[in-house]
Amino acid sequence: MYQVKGKWALITGAARGIGYLTAKFMAEQGCNLILHSRNLSHTEKVLAEVRSLGISAHAVAADLSDLSAVEAMLREIDSLGVDVDIVLNNAGLQIAYRTDYCATPAEDYEISFRVNTIAPAMICYHFLPKMISRGTGRILNTTSGIALDVCQAGYSASKAALDKITIDLGSKVEGTDVLINLTDPGWCRTDLGGSQAPNAPESAIPGIVTGVFVNDGKSGRYLGAQHFAGMTLEDAVKKAEAEFDSPYGK
């Protein structure tokens, strides 16, 4: 199992929901954290909580729909002088449900792709060469089970594009200890998922981070969190390595 104690991880969208739970879990494993949100005030609570667990942590802020803000955030992270060995691209934006799908505005696609595809891709491209140079690293991109839903076409298309980027990048790190995979929390009762969702946010732990801990050299696969609900981290990793092959397959 990949060891994260003392390593540094970037978690986007860490202030609430799945990102918040992910930050707490990773801190419990001894992982140092860089926590992203749109505003530094949003991460004050989680920053204090993870630091209380004895790890080092920093907060950064950026509007992921603004490429210049993403680039500024990456420069700020570089200025910290730490090696980011783990990237969890958790942040996402879900657009309105368009019952009249033929009236879907172009803006749905524009904002969805900026936040859900372009920003995580830029983050991947920034850190992946550094990981390859050091010979180790993990990138986990959060996708969605929403597919073939024309009423949420902008969102589903942006996640499908992220899936493709992840698979393609995975082929470039074959044979190394740098792994890049996909995760999906499932439909959870968060601000994004809504109150009607069937799954508690806590059900996504530890599955949402299983792709960080797998250590079998396989990239480009889908490791949906609900497949590992109720398991220990060790059992989740064993299941992932035994049952989930590459490339991507749900």
Regions found by a protein language model. Give the residues of each.
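Conserved glycine-rich cofactor-binding loop
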Residues: 8, 15-17, 39
